[in-house]
Amino acid sequence: MFTLKKSLLLLFFLATINLSFCEQERNAEEERRDEPDERNAEVEKRFFPIVGKLLFGLLGK
């Protein structure tokens, strides 16, 4: 029973690492394909909600 748990844990660990590497590769490929304008739009989409929440929190108190 112990060896089965050990094997499953090892398999899960290796699968998690493999998935992580796949995501990093995919993100790198997407960055290479993106045009600079598209990347700026993504940054703006992430930036404005954060600033809005921060200002709302400061002004709301």
UniProtKB/Swiss-Prot annotation:
Q: Which residues form the propeptide?
A: 23-46
InterPro entries (UniProt xref): Frog_antimicrobial_propeptide (IPR004275)
GO BP terms, alphabetized: defense response to bacterium; defense response to fungus; innate immune response; killing of cells of another organism
What does UniProt note about where in the body, tissue by tissue, this protein is expressed?
Answer: Expressed by the skin glands.
Instruction: Tell me, in one coarse class, where this protein mainly resides.
Output: secreted
> Where does the signal sequence lie?
1-22
Where is the protein localized? Secreted
Q: Give the modified residues of type Leucine amide.
A: L59
Entry annotated with the keyword Secreted: yes
Per the record, the similarity remark reads: Belongs to the frog skin active peptide (FSAP) family. Temporin subfamily.
Query: What does this protein's UniProt record list under function?
Result: Antimicrobial peptide with activity against Gram-positive and Gram-negative bacteria and against fungi. Has been tested against S.aureus (MIC=7.5 ug/mL), B.pumilus (MIC=15.0 ug/mL), B.cereus (MIC=75.0 ug/mL), E.coli (MIC=15.0 ug/mL), B.dysenteriae (MIC=30.0 ug/mL), A.cacoaceticus (MIC=60.0 ug/mL), P.aeruginosa (MIC=7.5 ug/mL) and C.albicans (MIC=5.0 ug/mL). Also shows a weak hemolytic activity.
* The protein's name: Temporin-ALj
Give the organism, scientific name: Amolops loloensis (Lolokou Sucker Frog)
